[in-house]
């Protein structure tokens, strides 16, 4: 009886070690947020003036990662206010902020609307916060209701005031 129990016990012990290795690999590969916030609202101010309001149904904080980021997997809306208190809005079904790189990525049905009737539709948009520059290398539709123009193309970059707009390829 002892001769059967010892090999059986050893087999069970060694079979568990493979499971432990798999579990350790899984926990290393899977990224877990440091925190989650529901019905998230963040108000950015400068000198007691509201500069931007970010809202999202869900914010996942991954500041515990080697390259920290904040994710908005259920959509995001940001309202920006300029010096004259004009409101510009950007919405997307997904957003991610990389604070150490000062880069914001929005994707899935991105719509940027300005107070003066300009509208940009694109599947993906980046904002370089350091340079205050917005760009996409994807297809876009840019509508200027004041001028009555619609521009379609692939790839575009501009400043946040839309005062310097460059379309890479128009279609």
Model-derived features: where do they sit?
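Mature-chain termini and adjacent capping regions
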Residues: 1-171
């Amino acid at each position: 009886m002892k001769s059967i129990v010892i090999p059986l016990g050893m087999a069970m012990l060694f079979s568990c070690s493979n499971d432990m290795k798999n579990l350790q690999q899984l926990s290393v590969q899977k990224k877990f947020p440091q925190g989650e916030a529901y019905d998230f609202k963040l108000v950015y101010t400068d000198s007691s003036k509201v500069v931007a309001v970010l809202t999202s149904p869900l914010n996942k904080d991954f500041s515990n990662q080697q390259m920290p980021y904040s994710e908005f997997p259920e959509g995001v809306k940001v309202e920006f206010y300029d010096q004259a208190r004009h409101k510009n809005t950007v919405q997307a079904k997904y957003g991610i902020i990389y604070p150490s790189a000062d880069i914001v990525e929005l994707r899935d049905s991105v719509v940027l609307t300005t107070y003066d009737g300009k509208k940009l539709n694109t599947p993906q948009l980046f904002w370089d916060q350091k340079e205050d520059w917005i760009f996409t290398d994807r297809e876009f539709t840019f509508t200027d209701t004041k001028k009555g123009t619609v521009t379609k193309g692939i790839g575009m970059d501009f400043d946040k005031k839309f005062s310097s707009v460059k379309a890479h390829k128009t279609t």
